[in-house]
Amino acid sequence: LDAWLGKEAIQYFREADLKEILRRHMLAEESEVNRTEAIGALNFLTIDDLPIESEGVDLDPRSFLRLPVRNGMPVFPHFRESPEDPFLRQVEASGKAWVVIADEAGEPLLIMDADGFLRHVLFQRQRTDPLAFCHRPVVVRDPAMPLGEAIVRLRFHAEASEDDLIDDDAILLWTDAPRLITGSDLLGRL
C-alpha cells in the first residue's frame, strides 16, 4: 500500500483544532473525556499563551522590605519574639502572605512566606532563621511575556547543602505594578 499511495504521514493538529476537538468531546454524551478533563486540557493549552500580567496577585506596597546585602544575601536585623518588635511589624504590615525582600536599591532578591515566618517566631519560641522562610523567585520584567516562557523557568534546586532557600518556585513580575504568581495560581487554572 505504501508503494501505491506513499507513506502515511502523521497528521498533527493545530492548537485551535485540538481545542475545538476538546470542546466537542466535552459536550458529547458518549465521549470518554468528561467536562472537568476537557476544561483542564483547554486551560493547559491556553496557559502558555497568556501574558504574564494576567496571572497572580498585585503586591501591596507595604509588602516590600529593603535590607542591606552581604555576599548576595539579605542581612536580616535582630528581632525579638514579640508582636511589638519593629522588624516583625514590618513583615506583618501588609497583612499579606508574601513579602518581597529587596536590596537597599529596591532590587528584588527573595520572597518571604510572612505567615509561616511570623507563626514560627511568635509561637514556636525557638530561634528562627528568616531565610528558612524565603524563596528565590523567577523575576520577570516584561508584562507581555507569555506565561509559558516563565513557567519553564520554575524549578527546585538547592545551590548548596546548607542553602535553605527554595529556588525558582514563584514568579515575580517586577514592573511599576508588581505581581506575584505562585504555583497555586497556576494550578488554579487547571
Which residue ranges define each predicted feature?
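Transmembrane alpha-helices and immediately adjacent membrane-cytoplasm interface residues
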Residues: 1-3
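Soluble cytosolic regulatory domains appended to membrane proteins
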Residues: 6-177, 181-190
